[in-house]
């Protein structure tokens, strides 16, 4: 059965996020990511021009998820204190559900990667 367009790309991002969840992983190499997926490094680069683009994919997921939930909270709750409380709860729940993404959000996973990644994550805050 043929793959749905973008399916492999999503698999790559999920594998990268899973690797980021493991404390033993420092800087993740494309070789290690390819090995986890049982594909060649060249296969990774058919879907992403660079490792930086893979991290950008994770950042886009973070932005889309958090901003969508934040906007819903802002629409549903008019009291500022309750909004703030719900925003904190949402961020903590997101972090608990996506521990690998926390390393991206804090910049830990981006150390030694392209500077634009850290700059983009800084804009998030």
Regions found by a protein language model. Give the residues of each.
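Basic, helix-initiating cap at the start of DNA-binding domains
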Residues: 1-23, 27-36, 53-56, 65
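Histidine kinase transmitter module recognition
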Residues: 4, 22, 46-47, 76, ...
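Hydrophobic alpha-helical connector segments
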Residues: 57, 71-97
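Amphipathic alpha-helical segments used for helix-helix packing
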Residues: 96-116
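Short hydrophobic/aromatic patch on the recognition helix
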Residues: 38-48
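Short, structured helix-loop boundary elements
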Residues: 9-10, 30, 52, 56, ...
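Amphipathic alpha-helical packing segments from all-alpha helical-bundle domains
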Residues: 64-67, 71, 115-125
């Amino acid at each position: 059965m043929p793959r749905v367009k973008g399916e492999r790309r999503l698999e790559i991002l999920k594998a990268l996020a899973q690797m980021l969840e493991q404390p033993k992983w420092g800087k993740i190499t494309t070789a290690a990511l390819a090995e986890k997926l049982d594909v060649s490094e060249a296969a990774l680069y058919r879907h992403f021009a660079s490792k930086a683009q893979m991290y950008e994919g994770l950042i886009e997921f973070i932005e889309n998820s958090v901003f969508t939930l934040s906007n819903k909270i802002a629409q549903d709750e008019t009291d500022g204190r309750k909004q703030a409380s719900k925003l904190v709860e949402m961020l903590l729940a997101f972090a608990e559900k996506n521990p690998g993404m926390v390393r991206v959000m804090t910049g830990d996973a981006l150390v030694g990667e392209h500077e634009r990644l850290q700059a983009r994550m800084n804009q998030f805050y």
